[in-house]
């Protein structure tokens, strides 16, 4: 197994209920606060607003609870245990159905509602502790179904097949992604980042030399080129760990804020270059950035790409851009957060290109994703000015800012299902 990919799927510890259908769209203000978290994570729900085989968080309130046994008075009680996977179906009909999935065993479990012939998944309950019950409510279409159970220290079990009559289309499932499906894309992505880090190291070297020479006008242009290169790497920041904090960290939460010695990297240099600091004040931060980038490049070949991150970051990159760049939060003087967002779009596109062969047959909303990327990018680049300058967010007119925010919010809705669709499953 190459050192650059990590196939192991972490065992979920917290409850999660997912549904492979899409009855409504989430509002922009919810998406702006939405945060995917690395598994395991309490109550993480996939969300989408597109029709077709995608994930949404239409969950009964009890399904969000992280502890206790939930009421099973309503709906079919589906048993999950080593001796009875998926037992308990009765009075099954097409249309909206509620299943109470109960773990009657002594070990943690998860259960999928699947098409037993194709393996397509319609719903999932994860982190199901012993003695607990979680509800699933979904639009059950006509066809054949079975529950598939994954219990700790037990082989995969598939329950009895149940036929639902009639001609109701219901929710459509999607084929689950496997670890093997994602190993190739992870290698391609690893190579993409390697090339990007080589470019970044050269650009940061130029920036450092310009600062040491006192050529601060040239350093400002070099800073922007290098920073955008880093932002185009997109998904990697989750893998970079502490290096990302050193290279692209904010002063938020530091005791001395902007003057704190722990405030390093691109934003520290940006602040100095655009707030009248002299070359001698910036020489130290520039040397530190150069050292950190070279260290990251040196260690990257041995770093792992978490397979879960490949799809996760397609949404999270631009979610972070909406929160920090399009609000102007991360403008430390250069006024280039719109350029940063455009670079984030490039990083998102790269991930989508790598994942495209896997997504095209699983996600019918993919054309809307590409259209959304094009729309947002076109709005951003109209704010580029001669000489490498950009309109700061604070200087945008109300109409243009609303257009950009709306385009970003819509795009996030289109991107939201991809993380769950590409999550490697057993």
Where are these regions (language model features)?
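Secretory targeting and sorting signals
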Residues: 4, 38-71
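Extracytoplasmic/periplasmic copper-protein system
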Residues: 68-82, 87, 154-187, 424
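Short coil/turn motif common to extracellular beta-sandwich-like domains
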Residues: 92-99
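Short beta-strand/loop motifs in extracellular/secreted proteins, especially
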Residues: 97, 107-111
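A short tyrosine-centered beta-strand micro-motif
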Residues: 97, 133, 143-149
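Asparagine-centered strand-capping/turn motif at beta-strand->loop junctions
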Residues: 101-105
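Short strand-edge motifs at loop-to-beta-strand transitions and within beta-strands
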Residues: 132-138
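Mature extracytoplasmic or organellar-lumen-exposed domains after removal of signal/transit peptides
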Residues: 170-426
């Amino acid at each position: 197994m190459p050192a650059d990919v990590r196939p192991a799927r972490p065992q979920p510890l917290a409850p999660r209920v997912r549904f492979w259908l899409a009855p409504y769209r989430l509002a922009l203000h919810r998406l702006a606060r939405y945060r995917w978290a690395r598994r395991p994570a309490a109550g993480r729900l996939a969300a989408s607003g597109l029709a077709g085989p995608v994930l949404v968080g239409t969950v009964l309130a009890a399904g969000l609870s992280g502890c206790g046994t939930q009421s099973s008075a309503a709906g079919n009680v589906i048993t999950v245990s080593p001796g009875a996977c998926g037992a308990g179906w009765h009075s099954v009909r097409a249309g909206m159905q509620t299943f109470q999935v109960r773990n009657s065993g002594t070990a943690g479990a998860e259960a999928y509602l699947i098409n037993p012939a194709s393996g397509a998944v319609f719903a999932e309950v994860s982190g199901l502790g012993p003695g607990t019950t979680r509800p699933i409510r979904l639009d059950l279409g006509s066809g054949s179904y079975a529950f598939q159970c994954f219990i700790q220290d037990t082989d995969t079990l598939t329950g009895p097949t149940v036929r639902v009559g009639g001609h109701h289309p219901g929710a459509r499932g999607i084929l689950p992604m496997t670890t093997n499906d994602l190993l190739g894309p992870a290698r391609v992505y690893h190579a993409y980042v390697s090339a990007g880090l080589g470019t970044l190291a050269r650009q940061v070297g130029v920036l450092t030399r310009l600062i040491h020479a006192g050529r601060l006008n040239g350093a400002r242009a070099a800073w922007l080129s290098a920073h955008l290169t880093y932002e185009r790497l997109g998904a990697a920041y989750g893998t970079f760990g502490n290096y990302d904090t050193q290279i692209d960290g904010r002063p938020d939460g530091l005791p001395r804020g902007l003057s704190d010695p722990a405030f390093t990297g691109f934003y520290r240099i940006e602040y100095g270059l655009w707030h009248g600091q002299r070359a001698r004040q910036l020489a130290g931060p520039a040397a530190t950035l150069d050292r950190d980038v070279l260290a990251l490049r040196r260690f990257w070949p041995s770093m792992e790409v978490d397979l879960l991150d490949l799809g996760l970051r397609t949404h999270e990159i631009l979610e972070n851009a909406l929160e920090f760049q399009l609000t102007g939060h991360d403008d430390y003087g250069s006024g280039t957060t719109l350029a940063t967002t455009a670079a984030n779009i490039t990083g998102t596109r790269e991930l989508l290109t790598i994942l495209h062969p896997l997504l095209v047959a699983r996600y019918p909303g993919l054309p809307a994703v590409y259209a959304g990327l094009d729309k947002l990018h076109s709005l951003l680049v109209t704010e580029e000015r001669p000489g490498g300058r950009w309109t700061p967010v604070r200087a945008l007119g109300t109409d243009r800012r609303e257009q950009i925010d709306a385009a970003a919010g819509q795009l996030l809705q289109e991107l939201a299902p991809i993380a769950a669709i590409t999550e490697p499953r057993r």
